[in-house]
């Protein structure tokens, strides 16, 4: 009898377990979607990490645009935005500004003045009226337009995963009220998605940076400057529990406004040059808008950008340059105005600047260097968290949340996985480890530095890539080596070699070296499993590094002192040999005295590479005692002040 009871219990257990499995199976892979005003983004938690998914155009962010062509075709995303210039009345965007609001809402009345498509009142709500081709007009609720964008994101995820997606986590601004949240959920339902959670965008961004994993209570300021909106939120996190303490911002400030300022500038400039007013040609204005947006993006990484438009207006071409300085000047008042909501949020939460533990930048417009500078200055030099693309951070956090809801066990330590566990760098003269990426930097990340040659007419530099915490490469772990050849003959320290380290989300390191003079390049790719360390080795190395820190410091000082003497001697040698500089101003006796002293020190260096710090310092002092009286004499006769250090610009040598 006992046996049957046990068997029944087992059966029951199996049935419950199977039911749980079924339940989990029903959910499938849950995706995280950032449904933005101007752009949307989708991510998924897969194989223990977040993947942000590129759309069919290869873009990781998709314009929140829907268009209806005269032929009756419906376009969503990039395709819709691309034909905005030719079909502005039937291209719908900014639906997020209308969703969940009533027709009489003052912000709706303000918005519809600026939208190129028609917004009408229906059931006390704003509806969008468009021509869907074949002479037919149709009205859509904002939820339906948002649903079309969500469908596009859902299809993007399905194409990547190779299976149906039915469940999602969708983000909304922290200030969205219940009606707006419910309307967003409804948009999901229309798109065939079960929206399991609606989470606040700033919370999602904080989760993306793993800030929910920190011990104790933390204050986090999220600065979110997107395409059309600006939101500042102050969150507190206490052991994984988030609370939005205060929010502020400007629902009408973002990248589009910066574009508008630049456009107005060029429209005025064009009128001044040609006497023609472009404003009345909708298509020309939209063409300009598209090119200005491209130029603005380019200016986040370069100092000027060209804007070229063929047959811009009445058959005439348009060609102008926009510099970063001009872009900043045109928008400076808007950039500065972003600080007021930050101040307000601090006041509302009763906190001082120094109480903020983390600053998180979100939204594509936070890539603008001036914005980053203003935020950093406001917080007295405190650096914001970095490492996740600002336009992907919200979707990233939504995907983490989605992973938890999918029942993925791996989400536990997620964000700890996504850092670079050890410092990465290259070997420079004297076996010194020159750091490019410090340990615990969140990946993906990219860092560049300029180096130079260590000897005259050096045709090749060898780039040795190491990981580890010790100041000297011999104590660190060699990851790979490659050569950059074909460097044209030049004195030491003259060639400029830019070394770039880039780690992608999969922890794959790419190191590139480029001779800035010739454009000559070479690179190496280092993957996780190739030659990498185990977590135990990493831990041991970090502990060792602390133990050895003191002796390492002494050794590095010795090498630095030697390098100082060497640089001083070679710099003098070059100047004495240059008739344009010191060489042309010295008397023959003085020249001979200096040449002899310099040669003597160079020879001594070659045979005493391992001398003590004191020896190197003494030799440098001896040389200075010979050189300085001669140079002082020159000063007396009005010569220019050549110092021994003149040409040694601050570049490490390879």
Swiss-Prot record:
Amino acids binding ATP: 36-39, 96, 227-229, 293-300, 364-367
UniProt cross-references to InterPro entries, sorted A to Z: ATPase_NBD, BIP_NBD, Heat_shock_70_CS, HSP70_C_sf, HSP70_peptide-bd_sf, Hsp_70_fam
Region described as Disordered: 631-654
Residues with the N6-methyllysine modification: 585, 591
Disulphide bridges: none
Cellular compartments per GO CC: cell surface; COP9 signalosome; cytoplasm; cytosol; dendritic shaft; endoplasmic reticulum; endoplasmic reticulum chaperone complex; endoplasmic reticulum lumen
Region of interest (Substrate-binding (SBD)), residue spans: 420-500
GO terms of biological process kind: cellular response to antibiotic; cellular response to calcium ion; cellular response to cAMP; cellular response to gamma radiation; cellular response to glucose starvation; cellular response to interleukin-4; cellular response to manganese ion; cellular response to nerve growth factor stimulus
Chain positions with N6-succinyllysine modification: 447
Subcellular location: Endoplasmic reticulum lumen; Melanosome; Cytoplasm; Cell surface
Region Required for interaction with ELAPOR1, residue ranges: 1-80
Positions where Omega-N-methylarginine occurs in the chain: 492
Record flagged with keyword rRNA-binding: no
Annotated region (Nucleotide-binding (NBD)), positions in chain: 125-280
List of residues that carry Phosphoserine: 86, 649
One Pfam family this sequence matches: HSP70
Keywords recorded for this protein, A-Z: Acetylation, ATP-binding, Chaperone, Cytoplasm, Endoplasmic reticulum, Hydrolase, Isopeptide bond, Methylation, Nitration, Nucleotide-binding, Phosphoprotein, Signal, Ubl conjugation
Modified residues (Phosphothreonine): 518, 643, 648
N6,N6-dimethyllysine: residues bearing it: 585
Cross-link (Glycyl lysine isopeptide (Lys-Gly) (interchain with G-Cter in SUMO2)): 352
Top EC class for this record: hydrolase
Homology family: Belongs to the heat shock protein 70 family.
Name of the protein in question: Endoplasmic reticulum chaperone BiP
Originating species: Rattus norvegicus
Taxonomic lineage of the native organism: Eukaryota, Metazoa, Chordata, Craniata, Vertebrata
Recorded name of the encoding gene: Hspa5
């Amino acid at each position: 009898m006992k046996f049957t009871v046990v068997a029944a219990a087992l059966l029951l257990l199996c049935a419950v377990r199977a039911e749980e499995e079924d339940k989990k199976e029903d959910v499938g892979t849950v995706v995280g979607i950032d449904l933005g005003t101007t752009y949307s983004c989708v991510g998924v938690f897969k194989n223990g990490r977040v993947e942000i998914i590129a759309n069919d155009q290869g873009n990781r962010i998709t314009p929140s645009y829907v268009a209806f062509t005269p032929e009756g075709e419906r376009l969503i995303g990039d395709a819709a935005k691309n034909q905005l210039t030719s079909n502005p009345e039937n291209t719908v965007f900014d639906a997020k500004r209308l969703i969940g609001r009533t027709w009489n809402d003052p912000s709706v009345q303000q918005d519809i003045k600026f939208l190129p498509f028609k917004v009408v009142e229906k059931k006390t709500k704003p509806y969008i009226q468009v021509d869907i081709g074949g002479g037919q007009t149709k009205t859509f609720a904002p939820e339906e337009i948002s649903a079309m964008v969500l469908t596009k994101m859902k299809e993007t995820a399905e194409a990547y995963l190779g299976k149906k997606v039915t469940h999602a986590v969708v983000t909304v601004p922290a200030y969205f009220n219940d009606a707006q949240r419910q309307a967003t959920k409804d948009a999901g339902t229309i798109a065939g998605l079960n929206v399991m959670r609606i989470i606040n965008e700033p919370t999602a961004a904080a989760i993306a940076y793993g800030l929910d994993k920190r011990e104790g209570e933390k204050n986090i300021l999220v600065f979110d400057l997107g395409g059309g909106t600006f939101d500042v939120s102050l969150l507190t996190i206490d052991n994984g529990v988030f609370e939005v303490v205060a929010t502020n911002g400007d629902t009408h400030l973002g990248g589009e406004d910066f574009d508008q300022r630049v456009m107005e500038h060029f429209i005025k400039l064009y009128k001044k040059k040609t006497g023609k007013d472009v404003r009345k040609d909708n298509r020309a204005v939209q063409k300009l808008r598209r090119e200005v947006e491209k130029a603005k993006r380019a200016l986040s990484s370069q100092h000027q950008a060209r804007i070229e438009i063929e047959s811009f207006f009445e058959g005439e071409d348009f060609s102008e340059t926009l510099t970063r300085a001009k872009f900043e000047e045109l928008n400076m008042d808007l950039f500065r105005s972003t600080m007021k909501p930050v101040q307000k949020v601090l006041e509302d939460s009763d906190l001082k600047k120094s109480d903020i533990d983390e600053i998180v930048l979100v939204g594509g417009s936070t890539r603008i260097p001036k914005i980053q500078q203003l935020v950093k200055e406001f917080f007295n030099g405190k650096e914001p968290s970095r490492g996740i693309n600002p336009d992907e951070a919200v979707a990233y956090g939504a995907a983490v949340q989605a992973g938890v809801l999918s029942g993925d066990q791996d989400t536990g330590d997620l964000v700890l996985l996504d850092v670079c566990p050890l410092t990465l760098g290259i070997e420079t003269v004297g076996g010194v480890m020159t750091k490019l990426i410090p340990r615990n930097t969140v990946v993906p990340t990219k860092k560049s530095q300029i180096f130079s040659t260590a000897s005259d007419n050096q045709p090749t530099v060898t780039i040795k890539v190491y990981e580890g915490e010790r100041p000297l490469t011999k104590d660190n772990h060699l990851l790979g080596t490659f050569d950059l050849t074909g460097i044209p003959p030049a004195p030491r320290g003259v060639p400029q070699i830019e070394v770039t380290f880039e780690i992608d989300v999969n922890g794959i390191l790419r190191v590139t070296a480029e001779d800035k003079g010739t454009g000559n390049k070479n690179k190496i790719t280092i993957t996780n499993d190739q030659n990498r360390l185990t977590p135990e080795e990493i831990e041991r190395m970090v502990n060792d590094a602390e133990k050895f820190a003191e002796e390492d410091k002494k050794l590095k000082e010795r090498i630095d002192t030697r390098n100082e003497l060497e640089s001083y001697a070679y710099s003098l040698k070059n100047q004495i040999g240059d008739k344009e500089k010191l060489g042309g101003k010295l008397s023959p006796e003085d020249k001979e005295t200096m040449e002899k002293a310099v040669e003597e020190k160079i020879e001594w260096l070659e045979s005493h590479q391992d001398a003590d710090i004191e020896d190197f310092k003494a030799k440098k002092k001896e040389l200075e005692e010979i050189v300085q009286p001669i140079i002082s004499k020159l000063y007396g006769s009005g010569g220019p002040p050549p110092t021994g250090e003149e040409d040694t610009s601050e570049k490490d040598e390879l």
